[in-house]
Amino acid sequence: MERAKILVVDDESRMRKLVKDFLTREGYTVLEARDGMEAMDLFYEDKEIALII
């Protein structure tokens, strides 16, 4: 079964990496955004995003 795609949004790259590494180990596909504007752009481009953190 394919896991959900998750968008991680945080202005601190270390925090994004920490969350991404954890979720990737659990089998999720993870996208990253630096801020809200970038997150909205990614969200509208990729209709498979199931969760935004």
Annotate each language-model stretch with its function.
Residues E26-V30:
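A generic structural motif
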Residues D10-D11, T24:
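Short, flexible segments with low predicted structural confidence
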Residues V8-V9, V19:
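Intrinsically disordered, low-complexity peptide-like regions
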Residues E12-R16:
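Short acidic/polar segment at the start of the alpha1 helix of CheY-like receiver
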Residues K17-R25:
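Charged docking surfaces used in two-component/phosphorelay signaling
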Residues L7, E32-L51:
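Acidic, metal-coordinating helix/loop segments flanking the phosphotransfer/catalytic sites
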Residues E2-R3:
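Phosphate-coordination loops involved in phosphoryl transfer and adenosine-cofactor binding
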